Regions:
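Serine-hydrolase catalytic machinery in alpha/beta-hydrolase-like enzymes
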Residues: 2-75, 164-166
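Alpha/beta-hydrolase fold nucleophile elbow
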Residues: 73-83
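Gly/Ala-rich beta-loop-alpha elbow adjacent to hydrolase catalytic centers
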Residues: 82-86, 90
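A conserved short beta-strand
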Residues: 99-109
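Short, proline-enriched alpha-helix->beta-strand connector loops that line the catalytic pocket
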Residues: 118-123, 150-152
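Short beta-strand/loop motif that positions the catalytic acidic residue
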Residues: 125-127
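Conserved alpha/beta-hydrolase "acid-adjacent" motif
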Residues: 132-138
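C-terminal catalytic histidine-bearing segment of alpha/beta-hydrolase fold enzymes
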Residues: 152-192
Length: 192
């Protein structure tokens, strides 16, 4: 319990004001938050444009950038967090970091290797229900694989919310779901 060191990764829209606002919210709750810019200043108006740029950079390069941004802050253990695509980045890093203190996933997950093993890593996922990028079958399989890997997983579903429902600048925004998300996320971080 106390101040967590958090690295918060943006979605395929890039490092937008909503990510900075989320970081400020977490800082106001007493945490240290880093917000790496994996897209090096580029932001996008549509998810399709952002996904095309993500694919142009490539998974390996994006993970390299994420590791380089996180490494200087990881001595005492990080909480990895991210929005949508950023959640998948956060998940990859958290599952590979034996010092990881937690994983906070906002609107997105990633596949994991069959041999992934963690020691009761606390994980909290916040996801729209339904979500256009994370089907019920996918989420069920993801949950079971994370549990089998040893993670302590908590899932919060938000019926009727849009995919990136915590971003007030997008049509997906749902103020009530966003507020419930931040309340639960703050409680999760306080429990670590």
């Amino acid at each position: 319990m106390g101040c967590m060191n958090i690295v918060l990764f943006h979605s395929t829209y890039g490092l937008r004001p909503a990510v900075h606002a989320a970081a400020d919210r977490l800082r106001a709750a007493g945490h240290q938050v880093q917000v790496p810019d994996l897209f090096e200043g580029r932001t996008f108006e549509t998810v399709e444009e952002g996904m095309a740029y993500r694919d142009e950079i490539g998974r390996d390069e994006l993970l390299r950038r994420a590791v380089l941004a996180s490494a200087p802050h990881s001595d005492q253990g990080l909480v990895y967090a991210g929005f949508s695509f950023g959640g998948s980045v956060a998940q990859h890093l958290a599952l590979a970091d034996e010092k990881a203190r937690g994983l906070l996933l906002l609107h997105g997950t990633a596949d994991l290797d069959e041999d992934t093993a963690v020691d009761e890593l606390p994980v909290q996922l916040h996801i729209a229900d339904p979500d256009p990028f994370e089907t019920h079958d996918w989420l069920t399989a993801w949950y079971l694989r994370m549990r089998r890997a040893g993670a302590d997983v908590e899932v919060h579903r938000y019926p009727g919310a849009g995919h990136l429902f915590t971003d007030p600048d997008l049509d997906d925004y749902d103020a009530e779901a966003a507020e419930r998300t931040w309340k639960a996320a703050t409680g999760f971080l306080d429990s670590l």
